[in-house]
Amino acid sequence: EKIDNWVDHPMIRPSINCVAMTYALAQDPQYEDLMTATSSLTGHKINRFTHLHQSSEDLVKKVKMQRLLGQKTASCFQRCVGMDAFNAVFSSTYEIDEKYGTHYHENFKKFLVYVQDNDLTVDGAMTDPKGDRSKAPHEQADPDMYVHVVERRPDGIVVCGAKCHQTGSINSHWHIFMPTIAMGEADKDYAVSFACPTDAEGLYMIYGRQSCDTRKMEEGCIDVGNAKFGGQEALVVLDHVFIPNEYIFLNGEYEFAGTIVE
């Protein structure tokens, strides 16, 4: 069956309701202290899901925020991995620039200010298909088992590959792609991290099913589970996607792949 209005489809709408709750609660004065923070980059009031942790108090509020949303939705609200990615990439890019004189940290700060100012949902994309897990990325029979650079240009890079099980990817405005394992020098083309808009040319999302998702469509008085809220995942495929230099945060500095993962 071809779905023309997927936004309101009963198997898909619940996941949209979940991420919408991260915006609704941030507008509620009752939850302002948990759901919002002051940006360390601009001094502006921002959604805590876009915040760089500055203290142990920030970390406690992060957990309390997640508990609150769990109570409100009883499901996945889809912005947690993106939030963790912000903090991991922020610190990692600083270390890379210190060693190599690159400009990844400034790239990332400019991107994050844009995310904060517009309260964007960003998917943290880390899990590659992997193929034969006994082999390194460069040893795979299919090179696209891990996201990798296939072309380097003066103005950016072209990437191919995929990321699996991307919760909330279809509801995200942007993706941050990161390595999924530590890598050696032979894998330097796979040591790549970047931001990419969801509607980029060459980016495809194959929507996945949820366990018991058809219960939300059944009639009668039988239990339909969590009817208003739910999850969704997608396989995100990159088919020769161009990434401009300003959105690149790692490009061949293989020894830092594990740093981002950690």
Question: Model regions: which residues?
Answer:
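Internal helix-loop-helix
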Residues: A24-V122
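A generic secondary-structure signal for well-formed alpha-helical elements
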Residues: Y23, Q27, V115, D119, ...
